[in-house]
Amino acid sequence: MEFRQLRYFIAVAEEGNIGAAARRLHISQPPITRQIQALEQDLGVVLFERTHRGVELTAAGTTFLEDARRLLHVTEISRVRSRAASRGEIGELRVAYFGTVVLHTLPLLLRQLLSVAPSATVSLTQMSKNRQIEALDAGTIDIGFGRFYPYQEGVVVRNVTNERLFLGAQKSRARSFGEQVHCSALRNEPFILFPREGRPSFADEVIGVFKNARVEPKVVAIVEDVNAAMALALAGVGVTIVPETVAMISWPDFGFTELVGSKATVPVSCIYRHDHIAPILKTFLNLLPIRESQ
């Protein structure tokens, strides 16, 4: 059975006349007759009966007409979807993330993708940086987001934005610094940094920012994540440094002051394999901003 046979059959059934169907299809009558006969032979049934006006569907033909229309409809949908997939307009983008990028930066980027490819789907999985690299190699994710990725052959690391840094502390303590505080003013502050694992990490970057400002930070604890750091800071153990995405959220009894001096920013990066870029990933990558690390 061929798709052209279905098209010819539907045209004859709807027109009730082979000549009219030929004019509709812009072909001569003999090819239609041959293909209808071949279709009947393939199905093992008679689809049409001749009348003085043309042809009429048999009972078998009436039943097959419904199926033929359904088959062509499904085929057309498949054709449209496959072409859209090849253009990166549909498909599933499998995204992994680590850290606070999921709070603000990543949702904004995914919103851009869905605005140009509304039929696309997105899956999100939290993964450490090393697991993201393993998942890229295994082909179980398309792209990962985080900070400070280690070098891995075949994996592209691309900086997509830079976030400002903020001091986080009990609200009254944070307010005492004003709207901005320079690194040099925090020389004697006890710091709670994060994360403990996945070095180099955000904690290493924060230490580097202070050292570039000629300040040796007094680190009293390096904890698992931002939640633990903020909990200890709220308890009065010390102060912490967080990226802008965390400071954008309203936290009860917790305040933030912008850190300035010595390029007090941290990058948000994405990683993907250069030799495995699916069309939907290519569409997403074309939407991502390109930023220089600061």
From Swiss-Prot:
Transmembrane segments: none
Keywords: Activator, Aromatic hydrocarbons catabolism, Cytoplasm, DNA-binding, Plasmid, Transcription, Transcription regulation
DNA-binding region: 18-37
The UniProt record lists the keyword Phosphoprotein: no
One GO process term, biological-process aspect: catabolic process
Gene Ontology terms: cellular component: cytoplasm; protein-DNA complex
Localization per Swiss-Prot or TrEMBL: Cytoplasm
Record CDD domains: PBP2_ClcR (cd08485)
Domain of life: Bacteria
The protein's name in its UniProt record: HTH-type transcriptional regulator ClcR
Gene: clcR
